[in-house]
Amino acid sequence: MELVLVFLCSLLAPTVLASAAEKEKEMDPFHYDYQTLRIGGLVFAVVLFSVGILLILSRRCKCSFNQKPRAPGDEEAQVENLITANATEPQKAEN
C-alpha cells in the first residue's frame, strides 16, 4: 500500500512543479524583449537616415540658398527710401 501511495505522489510531483512555474510566469506579466526593441530601433533609425540622405541627394527640396546675401545697411536704405518717397508725394486735398 505504501508503495502505491509513493508511486501516486511521484506522479503528482511534476504537475505541482509545473503549476508553480506557471504561477511564477503569471506573477511577472511584464517581460520586455530588449533585443527585439534594440533591433527595431536600429532599423527605424536606418530608414530615417536613408530617407534624409535620399531627400538631400534628390534635390527635390527647393531651398533658397542661391539668394544674394544682403549687406547690413540694405534694410535701412530701403526704409529711408520709402520715407523720402512718401514725403515727396503731393498731399491729396481732403474733401
Swiss-Prot record:
<dbReference type="GO" id="GO:0098978">
    <property type="term" value="C:glutamatergic synapse"/>
</dbReference>
<keyword id="KW-0732">Signal</keyword>
<feature type="topological domain" description="Cytoplasmic">
    <location>
        <begin position="59"/>
        <end position="95"/>
    </location>
</feature>
<dbReference type="GO" id="GO:0042734">
    <property type="term" value="C:presynaptic membrane"/>
</dbReference>
<keyword id="KW-0472">Membrane</keyword>
<dbReference type="InterPro" id="IPR047297">
    <property type="entry name" value="FXYD_motif"/>
</dbReference>
<feature type="signal peptide">
    <location>
        <begin position="1"/>
        <end position="18"/>
    </location>
</feature>
<keyword id="KW-0740">Sodium/potassium transport</keyword>
<comment type="function">
    <text>Associates with and regulates the activity of the sodium/potassium-transporting ATPase (NKA) which catalyzes the hydrolysis of ATP coupled with the exchange of Na(+) and K(+) ions across the plasma membrane. Reduces the apparent affinity for intracellular Na(+) with no change in the apparent affinity for extracellular K(+). In addition to modulating NKA kinetics, may also function as a regulator of NKA localization to the plasma membrane.</text>
</comment>
<keyword id="KW-0406">Ion transport</keyword>
<keyword id="KW-1003">Cell membrane</keyword>
<keyword id="KW-0812">Transmembrane</keyword>
<dbReference type="InterPro" id="IPR000272">
    <property type="entry name" value="Ion-transport_regulator_FXYD"/>
</dbReference>
<dbReference type="GO" id="GO:0043269">
    <property type="term" value="P:regulation of monoatomic ion transport"/>
</dbReference>
<comment type="subunit">
    <text>Regulatory subunit of the sodium/potassium-transporting ATPase which is composed of a catalytic alpha subunit, a non-catalytic beta subunit and an additional regulatory subunit. The regulatory subunit, a member of the FXYD protein family, modulates the enzymatic activity in a tissue- and isoform-specific way by changing affinities of the Na+/K+-ATPase toward Na(+), K(+) or ATP.</text>
</comment>
<keyword id="KW-0630">Potassium</keyword>
<keyword id="KW-0915">Sodium</keyword>
<dbReference type="GO" id="GO:0017080">
    <property type="term" value="F:sodium channel regulator activity"/>
</dbReference>
<keyword id="KW-0633">Potassium transport</keyword>
<comment type="similarity">
    <text>Belongs to the FXYD family.</text>
</comment>
<feature type="transmembrane region" description="Helical">
    <location>
        <begin position="36"/>
        <end position="58"/>
    </location>
</feature>
<keyword id="KW-0813">Transport</keyword>
<dbReference type="GO" id="GO:0045211">
    <property type="term" value="C:postsynaptic membrane"/>
</dbReference>
<protein>
    <recommendedName>
        <fullName>FXYD domain-containing ion transport regulator 6</fullName>
    </recommendedName>
</protein>
<feature type="topological domain" description="Extracellular">
    <location>
        <begin position="19"/>
        <end position="35"/>
    </location>
</feature>
<dbReference type="GO" id="GO:0006813">
    <property type="term" value="P:potassium ion transport"/>
</dbReference>
<keyword id="KW-1133">Transmembrane helix</keyword>
<dbReference type="Pfam" id="PF02038">
    <property type="entry name" value="ATP1G1_PLM_MAT8"/>
</dbReference>
<dbReference type="GO" id="GO:0006814">
    <property type="term" value="P:sodium ion transport"/>
</dbReference>
<keyword id="KW-0739">Sodium transport</keyword>
